[in-house]
């Protein structure tokens, strides 16, 4: 079977946004108009096609990014224009801050993105976070200002906020006509026409009309700004424009596309997905301005086993190259078992092929291959460069692994995942479920790299670690639904860290004599604090064989054993470096083990001398509240050891920004609801680690000692 759609007709893009901006509704409408789902699912009914896990439907939020393939032909006047059918692979990403990791994984495999904003709230904190992630992956994007039918909707305020908050240049290409209940349609600034949605056919048809007199001046002004941005992309067009000639429509689209792909600016459109207005122009804009796999620069990978990770192996969207792909998501499907969502970067993959997982160095066989449409699937026999597919039955592949042709191996990506900041103890309600719970947790951890499961050595308890309370709540919920395990959970605990505050030099001698050969090792260590975030490093400065080479790995092993359990309260130690500068050994009594013990004991003593201190995660908190509650909320944040860093008006509400220790934020949602009669909302994300005040540090040490 040959390729059905040429690569220039592909668009792999994600839909990203803050929680509640209407992202899932947008995806739904896209699937409806592109003919993939026959009735529109509403999030409020708990029936959206993209939100396919039961809990998502209950909570009305999106948790897993489902990947969907659908098709679209550019439409004008409700009739199809003379452009061929494009193939859209859409990834719906979650907007809730606890699931930032999902967004990160999706961005790594997308070519472009549509950022959905709430017309009333504008650029919210999570939007900024996702935007920064997209900047890091250099993803070209456009903005859809959604919910233009809401009270307080303000399109131009959103355009200003995009520029103020993200630093990007926002270029409106379509301006909504009217707002709130008066929303009628859109002025298309490229063709200078009105699109009006009037019928009762769920927005499937619309009419085009000349721009009414009352809107002409505004349309001309914004069209001028758009053309100025576009002609900056091409010297000839700029000269023509300065001589008074505007570019024609195809040229204008070409220049806008060029600027979007180069990340010089971001096209902006408005509408209301819920009211079915403005979705078709959004789809046209995806085709006009977002990249196809051919527009993306070569994907550079490195040779498996290369510790330097020199990225000198190119992979691009070309069927004739060797196969390479990236597994970006694992899902448990009730009918097929484990599904591995994979982006094919180069080459062709056929059913029955054997491929190499170059990240793990293991071979995998391709059993069933599927094209996914939200929650139903189509079996396929081969996949081509640019496709996003699901593979069933892979044994060793986890999120972020590269799959490739064993004859031409490459590692494409090493995904970095943040450390969890919160942990809870969990145990099954009935002892007989212990085994089932362990299996369930292991499968959930395979799906989600930001979730870790560990066993506490001293208490034997199972500990779940994650990115926030909602994150862990949902995982406990999934244990119950998918694995039928009822679990009891303990109170959430903060993931503290330990570090040191000054450099010390410390000598430790380990001597043990008990008849026969004894144990002897002496080490002299310099322990130095490093900058926050630099992590740990070890070096040996031994000269003249004071400690023989073969014992030095033992020294490092001893030091590392202290890293997992620091001297104050047994928390992991971060941001320090150790140098072994001198030592003594004995021809008979010294061994690797003796040096390991000496280094471990030396570190424990040395760290106490080096001013060991506890660190706690500090969260960046933003509370959006009606003005009358600000005084009480600020007072409450301060009482939680928070530092309020500023407040600003946002629409008809106030946004309060603060840094607050995570330890004081548990259950905050309930306090906030009762303080504001349920009208305020907050988001928080991990920002940095800070030293714990001495009195609290003493309490924590007493508790864990």
Swiss-Prot record:
GO CC annotations, alphabetized: cytoplasm
Chain sites annotated for binding GTP: 17-24, 92-96, 146-149
Annotated localization: Cytoplasm
Keyword GTP-binding: yes
GO molecular function, one term: GTP binding
InterPro entries in the record: EF-G-like_DII, EFG_II, EFG_III, EFG_III/V, EFG_IV, EFG_V, EFG_V-like, G_TR_CS
Pfam families: EF-G_D2, EFG_C, EFG_III, EFG_IV, GTP_EFTU
Keywords: Cytoplasm, Elongation factor, GTP-binding, Nucleotide-binding, Protein biosynthesis
Domain named tr-type G: residues: 8-294
SUPFAM superfamilies: EF-G C-terminal domain-like, P-loop containing nucleoside triphosphate hydrolases, Ribosomal protein S5 domain 2-like, Translation proteins
Domain of life, source organism: Bacteria
GO biological process entries: ribosome disassembly
Gene3D superfamilies: 3.30.230.10, 3.30.70.240, Elongation Factor G (Translational Gtpase), domain 3, P-loop containing nucleotide triphosphate hydrolases, Translation factors
PROSITE patterns: G_TR_1, G_TR_2
Physiological role: Catalyzes the GTP-dependent ribosomal translocation step during translation elongation. During this step, the ribosome changes from the pre-translocational (PRE) to the post-translocational (POST) state as the newly formed A-site-bound peptidyl-tRNA and P-site-bound deacylated tRNA move to the P and E sites, respectively. Catalyzes the coordinated movement of the two tRNA molecules, the mRNA and conformational changes in the ribosome.
Family per record: Belongs to the TRAFAC class translation factor GTPase superfamily. Classic translation factor GTPase family. EF-G/EF-2 subfamily.
Protein name: Elongation factor G
Natural source organism: Ruegeria pomeroyi (strain ATCC 700808 / DSM 15171 / DSS-3)
Gene: fusA
